[in-house]
């Protein structure tokens, strides 16, 4: 089921020219599927919010972009990468979920007039988060945040959406609450390339912004999908599919089991954040930045079981 809507926060007429990103590389991971691998570093004026894996799929008729990056400069760099590969128009921009490292570059594509596609829950979450997200972006990037406007989706997905790029069929699929409550994946049927966005983290600490039990359930559903290639939301690996999901599943299982034990033993949420899952620290980048938040999310969910 689809719903249509449109809204853009306009860029001021006096806006400065956006900063440029140098050495913006894309890798063809399968025929017609191009990925730019973002940094694990925190957002800063040096990386301009280039912190997530983003990319595009090229059809004979048009291009589908998978996430737009964390700022206008990142989005513009991605659009230039598209143009280095093909002159065909960009017809779809899929915003896989409502996290700023994936959507703040969307304004770069407005002149192409694509459909901006998101999960049906995306607008509700964005309405609640837009102002703080913009404030944090300006805090982190300063003047380099100029023009990184919020672009609302024009097409909402409830379930599954099949798209024809011309000689290439692509499936956009919504998922139950997991990483967020508005997760989408993209599957290129021609090459069986699975773009998972933040339903898959490789080496970077996975993040729970919805439900740990839901995330574990979705991982089991993801494992059943037959794919020859995959793209994570963060990180990269040569581990075959679906075994690449195993470290993430292990991490969540450790948090789940140890948080339940902490609750049974009447530990406070503060105690849980200081004790649960610390054995996993050696396995993940950005562990200190995200792990305690994951335990907090898990505790608030599991204490009501």
Regions found by a protein language model. Give the residues of each.
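N-terminal export signals
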Residues: 1-15
């Amino acid at each position: 089921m689809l719903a249509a809507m449109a809204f853009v926060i306009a860029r001021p007429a006096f806006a400065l020219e956006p900063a440029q990103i140098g050495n913006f590389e894309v890798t063809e991971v399968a025929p017609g599927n191009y990925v730019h691998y973002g940094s694990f570093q925190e957002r800063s004026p040096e990386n301009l919010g280039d912190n997530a894996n983003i990319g595009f799929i090229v059809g004979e008729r048009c291009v589908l972009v998978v996430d737009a990056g964390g700022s206008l400069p990142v989005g513009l760099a991605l659009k230039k990468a598209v143009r280095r590969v093909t002159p065909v128009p960009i017809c779809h921009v899929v915003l896989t979920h409502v996290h700023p490292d994936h959507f703040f570059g969307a304004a770069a594509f407005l002149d192409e007039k694509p459909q901006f596609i998101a999960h049906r829950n995306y607008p509700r979450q964005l309405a609640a988060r837009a102002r703080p997200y913009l404030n944090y972006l300006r805090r982190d990037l300063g003047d380099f945040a100029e023009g990184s406007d919020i672009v609302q989706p024009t097409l909402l997905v409830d379930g599954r959406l099949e798209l024809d790029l011309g000689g290439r069929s692509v499936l956009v699929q919504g998922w139950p609450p997991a990483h967020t409550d508005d997760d989408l994946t993209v599957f290129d049927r021609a090459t069986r390339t699975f773009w998972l966005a933040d339903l898959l983290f490789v080496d970077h600490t996975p993040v729970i912004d919805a439900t740990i039990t839901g995330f574990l359930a979705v991982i089991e559903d993801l494992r059943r999908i037959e794919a020859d290639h995959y793209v994570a939301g963060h990180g990269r690996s040569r581990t075959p599919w679906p075994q690449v999901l195993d470290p993430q599943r292990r991490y969540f299982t450790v948090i789940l089991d140890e948080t339940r034990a902490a609750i049974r033993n009447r530990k406070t949420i503060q105690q849980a954040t200081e004790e649960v899952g610390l054995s996993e620290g050696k396995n993940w980048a950005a562990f200190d930045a995200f792990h305690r938040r994951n335990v907090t999310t898990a505790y608030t969910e599991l204490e009501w079981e």
